[in-house]
């Protein structure tokens, strides 16, 4: 046994290991027994076998709770977003879980390029050694089967564009972790300062708030697949087939229903829920010399 550990009693060793790992007393006792009371080796043992044990004990349980995060770069040109799931809201609402989400998001962020546009699979995330280590440590401490559900690196499509985000139901101990995360990409008709101006950032933040509340399906009409629009038209025409209305009247009705469909599903076509007088988002952004490029929405439920 290393000299530094010889002066500590078994009780003190267990207490020290519990403090550093967050594992239970019996797990710590077993780890020390397996590693000859070597604290460093016992901590590694817990990382390897403690997380595996947690996975075995909770196999088959649904990971329906959790948190999402948005780590934005200081120039507002790229960000890393993660969805991390737990079994219970008791775990997901704890400061320990929030700290884990922040740590693992930071580690994913350092493993990716700021010029990358990519969604990572769980397997790709676990292949990052420091990310896997972070997960193993958290599973020992939190004692639930945690899941790195998804991670996305979002980067502006042009240098003149900028991003901003909004977190709904923030965790008490974090400004960038919560239950819903919305990110918007906005283009400027003139060269955008880097970082964007406070006014531009506020416009982006409010638009992201709208996204979190309205949960649109598309950013622009152009993003809707032609097959989706044709299917909607077929449904509308089927609903009117027994009305004996003239074709030109039916066409007007279909166009009106399509406008309503766009207003319900397309971000640009919606009334802005956060701006005064609820202007149409496309028109409002145009009045500010801006236009919508895209949005991303992550939600636990």
Positions of the model-derived regions?
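N-terminal assembly/interaction segments in proteins that build large macromolecular machines
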Residues: 2-301
